[in-house]
From Swiss-Prot:
Cellular localization per UniProt: Mitochondrion
Record's keyword annotation contains Transit peptide: yes
GO BP field: DNA recombination; meiotic cell cycle
Source taxon at top rank: Eukaryota
Gene that specifies this protein: MSC6
Repeat in keyword set: no
Transit peptide region: 1-27
Keywords of this entry: DNA recombination, Meiosis, Mitochondrion, Transit peptide
Identification of the protein by name: Meiotic sister-chromatid recombination protein 6, mitochondrial
Record-level GO cellular component terms: mitochondrion
Primary localization: mitochondrion
Physiological role: May be involved in the control of meiotic sister-chromatid recombination.
Length: 670
């Protein structure tokens, strides 16, 4: 029997609940339904687009003049957007001779002008026309469409957010046709605030440049100017790039920037290399972070400078950040320090600061204290920045009271990490609400104050919940104004610092109530599930998952973002507690995964196999049901994944599993 009967029942119940909660699309207004029907009839003519456009204009104007629809209603409706996009596509194909026609069709640009006049043009229509014009080499006309788009946006109730990067990318490509590109001119063209270089959609331009059908000469211009813009950001705007752009990057964009940096001939810049190292490790790409280090050391002739060595401490610390046993991770930090820093005649403040930061990442606050007392020279302890890093470590120590900490603070806190640590200690100390507000106002408001980070705002949410008159009705997203672009980052930080199950449940409910469904995604739910496991509450984690898949109208509720935290969470419970009963939970969620994926993702395999190996090493008592899951499902999937996709686990995992004679490890895995 492949799966246990109990596990099958659990999976079936989940799937039935999911299937029974399909949410229908909101109904359109009757007037729009009438217009949709008339337009569908008008557009039946597949050959004479000129006649179609004339009939379209007559139909829309007739409905408007009869008082059925206002310009505002037309601007807000998207019910006919796709059908009108097909007209643009048909025009393009007829002009290229792909579709026969008895008349000369209106061009996509002419159709767009009509749609703009009728208040029916949408962002995707501007994109289609710009793509058509760029493919035909008409950059100036494409930029004219961009200007029309900006006029259209000014009429809309709100900008279109991340999706706007496509039309911005087409405008950028048109600009690249015209000559040598300048990053400040491009930013101005895109109608973005001066100095906000992060708004330039470079990654989208990378994606689209080869998909438009540009001539070879124009494609060359685009590639050359794209490289020039990257170089200007990396070299001329290096400070902004390191401080603003890199910390907000996730993997695809970060990897793209690193490739551009690597392609710059003769550039050996340890500040940039260190920036890439730290940010790759920030998103968990530790192997790539080490590649950055090795590449930079090679370029530097085998002698890493102080900046690179300091970054190495951060990377090694983050490698051990999620380790169950952080003693070994601390030993690796000590090994790096002894190998790379002890040999220096003079160790500067920046390196001691990097060492303290590494220990703070590992939550080894006792080590922060001992390094401060035993290793750091007295004259360096007077350094303002180093002192604040040390005090950050003190703020996290449970044996340092809030009054003791406040006595040691400088008059003005200028390190945002220290400020956040102080706020967090206040949020976790009863009766400190007024003190919290006073410190926040002094540090983050007024002239010369610090800029709040996502962690700052997350800590305000934590304090807001702790002091709410009725926590059961507290809405996190009504409590503190959060910029739209920071919402996800603030949510992630809150879930890292929250250790209260009831607060996590309330945060989930607040998210459902306050955020649009495209924002309240499975990624967010996965983070909430992960947070529940981190505080040891697997029952809340499961309850949130089940509620999400049965009440959300997201297109795909069961995916890697929601399943991986469950599989990782139960695997970690097995590792921490040597508790084999959680294998039945893994069995359930593996079955769900098998219904979503043709191949079980590698992350699932690795987490589960590591948990099984731990049980075998500790000689845990497994039931027949457990052995059936391991042998019939896990081992067979590991073998198939290696054969089909080349997935290979650490050999030590298999070696540990073979200690249990009742588990049959396929020979090809050994």
């Amino acid at each position: 029997m492949l799966f246990s009967r109990a596990s099958k029942i659990r999976v079936s119940q989940l799937m039935r609940r999911l299937q029974s909660t399909a949410v229908g699309r909101a109904a359109s207004r009757p007037e729009m339904l009438q217009l949709e029907a008339k337009l569908a009839d008008v557009m039946k003519d597949k050959k004479d687009l000129g006649r179609v456009m004339a009939a379209l204009r007559e139909t829309v104007q007739g409905v408007v003049e009869s008082g059925g629809l206002s310009d505002r209603t037309l601007l807000r409706s998207n019910s006919v957007t796709n059908d009108l996009g097909k007209l643009l596509e048909q025009s393009n194909k007829q002009l290229r001779g792909e579709i026969e026609t008895d008349t000369v069709p209106p061009t996509p640009y002419e159709i767009l002008v009509t749609l703009v006049d009728l208040k029916l043009a949408r962002r995707t229509h501007y994109e289609q026309v710009m793509q058509y014009l760029l493919a035909n080499g008409d950059a100036e006309a494409a930029l004219g469409v961009w200007v029309k788009y900006l006029e259209f946006v000014a009429q809309m109730p709100q900008r279109e957010g991340a999706e706007e990067t496509y039309v911005m990318a087409y405008a950028s490509i048109a600009y690249f046709f015209l000559g040598a590109a300048d990053v400040d001119v491009l930013l101005q063209l895109l109608n973005r605030e001066a100095g906000q270089y992060k708004d330039i959609p470079l990654f989208r331009i990378e994606q689209l440049q080869s998909q438009i059908g540009l001539s070879e000469s124009n494609l060359t211009k685009v590639r050359e100017n794209l490289a020039a813009i990257h170089k200007q950001l990396l070299v001329d705007k290096k400070g902004y790039f390191l401080d603003v752009i890199l910390p907000e990057c996730y993997y695809p964009l970060l990897h793209s920037y690193y490739k551009r940096y690597s392609d710059l001939e003769g550039l050996v810049d340890e500040d940039l290399a260190a920036g890439f190292m730290i940010n790759f490790s920030r998103i968990g790409k530790h192997t790539l972070a080490m590649k950055c280090y090795n590449d930079a050391v090679k370029k530097a002739g085998g002698k890493p400078g102080v900046v690179l060595k300091n970054a190495l401490l951060t990377v090694v610390a983050r490698m051990g950040e999620t380790a169950i046993n952080r003693v070994n991770a601390t030993r690796r930090i000590e090994a790096v320090w002894n190998s790379y820093f002890r040999e220096d005649d003079v160790i500067d403040v920046s390196s001691y600061k990097a060492l303290l930061n590494a220990l703070i990442i590992l939550k080894r606050f006792d080590k922060v204290q001992s390094v401060w007392e035993l290793d750091i020279p007295e004259e360096l302890k007077k350094d303002h920045t180093l002192l604040q890093t040390y005090l950050e470590g003190c703020a996290h120590r449970t044996n340092v009271s809030l009054p003791e900490l406040l006595k040691q603070l400088p008059e003005a806190v200028t390190d945002v990490n220290l400020a956040n640590a102080v706020l967090l200690k206040m949020a976790n100390t009863s009766g400190s609400a007024s003190m919290f507000d006073s410190f926040y106002d002094k540090t983050f408001k007024g002239p010369g104050s610090l800029r709040p980070t996502p962690l700052t705002l997350a800590t305000r949410l934590l304090m807001g919940y702790a002091t709410a008159s009725d926590p059961a009705k507290f809405n996190f997203f009504d409590h503190t104004p959060i910029p739209r672009t920071m919402k996800n980052a603030v949510a992630e930080e809150f879930l890292k610092i929250c250790s209260d199950s009831e607060a996590i449940k309330r945060f989930y409910e607040s998210s459902k109530a306050s955020l649009k469904l495209d924002v309240f995604s499975s990624r967010r739910v996965g983070k909430i599930i992960e947070a529940s496991f981190n505080i040891g509450d697997w029952k809340t984690a499961e309850a949130i998952f089940k509620d999400h898949i049965t009440t959300s109208n997201a297109k795909s509720q069961i995916n890697v973002h929601t399943l991986l935290p469950l599989i990782a969470g139960f695997s970690n419970l097995i590792l921490r507690n040597n508790e084999p009963s959680f294998l039945s939970k893994l069995d359930t969620y593996w079955q769900l995964a098998s219904r979503v994926y043709k191949t079980i993702p590698f992350e699932f395999l690795n987490k589960t196999a590591t948990a099984v190996a731990s049980l075998c090493l500790k000689e845990a008592k497994l039931t027949d049901e457990h052995y059936n899951f391991i042998n019939a499902v896990v081992m067979s999937e590991l073998a198939r994944s290696k054969k089909d996709h080349g997935y290979v686990l650490n050999a030590r995992i298999y070696h540990s599993i073979t200690k249990d004679q009742k588990i049959s490890v396929p020979p090809e895995l050994l």
